[in-house]
């Protein structure tokens, strides 16, 4: 399916390239595609604009599209292949919230679905809008805990020089 969507994306780009360029439209689209075929394991793919794709693995159990640089460190430090699904969902929300905190162009609504292996249906959906109490509570708690962790960090063990000799530590 990922190959099919990638091929269709490439065909649309080739077909409409003249008009897209004429109107100065930068046609870039990435897709997250996840699901399960009966009798197989669930799969998750990231399909890129040119049509190529990568698959989530045990080593890389999550994929991200859009503004990724602000929220990815939380995912990298928290998510493993064996992280429970509910914890992954909370981490995804923290990742998005961190991105919203650092980039004003990113904001609600946040739509999230959670798929359980072999259920063959989406039973869990979530939409968080601006001012949602859960989103506000999550942000407040996260900021408090990050501040507490920061304050608990050990002090830097500086090397102290007691003489006044000047030494150039910069390299030209």
Residue map of PLM features:
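N-terminal nucleophile
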Residues: 1-172
């Amino acid at each position: 399916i990922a190959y099919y969507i990638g091929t269709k994306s490439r065909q649309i780009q080739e077909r409409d390239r003249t008009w897209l360029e004429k109107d100065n439209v930068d046609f870039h689209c990435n897709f997250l595609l996840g699901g399960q075929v009966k009798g197989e394991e669930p799969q998750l793919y990231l399909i890129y604009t040119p049509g190529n794709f990568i698959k989530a693995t045990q080593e890389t159990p999550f994929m991200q599209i859009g503004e990724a640089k602000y929220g990815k460190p939380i995912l990298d430090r928290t998510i493993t292949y064996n992280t429970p699904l509910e914890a992954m969902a909370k981490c995804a929300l923290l990742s998005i919230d961190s991105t919203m905190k650092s980039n004003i162009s990113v904001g609600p609504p946040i739509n999230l679905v959670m798929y359980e292996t072999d259920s063959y249906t989406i039973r869990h959906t979530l939409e968080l809008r601006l001012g949602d109490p859960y989103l506000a509570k999550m942000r407040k708690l996260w900021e408090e805990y990050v501040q507490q962790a920061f304050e608990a960090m050990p002090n830097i063990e500086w090397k102290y020089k007691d003489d006044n000799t000047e030494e150039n530590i910069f390299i030209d």
